[in-house]
A protein has these predicted regions:
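Charge-rich, low-complexity N-terminal segments
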Residues: 3-127
């Protein structure tokens, strides 16, 4: 019930998804292993901000999951160097790629985060 919400109520919901992918990367440091084809399990999370509607939700998380499924299919078990529109497979470019794919479908999209837990790397994109 939105009558229980403080005014103005601003919330941020999130949904995670995972994908496994391979890539190469041209780097100045730790270059040898990066130049070879290698893979990671990526953990991504998207955030949607807004005020709850009459249904008490910022957005139905089922709609978020549906949009994520389409993006995940473009990345999961793919060679990222060949994904159109991605560019070099950096965490920064992955965040931007996911943002651009989701932004038209998810009004209120406020951030995209991509992590590689195995090596402790993370990037957050907040325009």
């Amino acid at each position: 019930n939105t009558a229980l919400m403080p005014d103005p109520a601003m919330f941020e919901i999130s949904q995670r998804f995972y994908f496994d992918a391979a890539h190469t990367l041209q780097r100045e440091i730790e270059a040898q292993g990066s130049k070879r084809v290698h893979g990671h399990t990526y953990h991504a999370e998207v955030f949607v901000q807004g005020q709850p509607g009459d249904n008490g939700m910022v957005m139905d998380l089922g709609l978020v999951r549906q949009a994520l499924k389409e993006v995940r299919e473009q990345l999961d078990h793919h060679y990222l160097d060949e994904v159109p529109g991605l560019g070099p497979a950096t965490l920064e470019n992955l965040c931007l790629f996911i943002w651009r794919a989701l932004q038209p479908q998810l009004p209120g999209l406020s951030a995209v985060q991509v992590e590689r837990h195995s090596i402790g790397d993370k990037c957050v994109y907040r325009p």
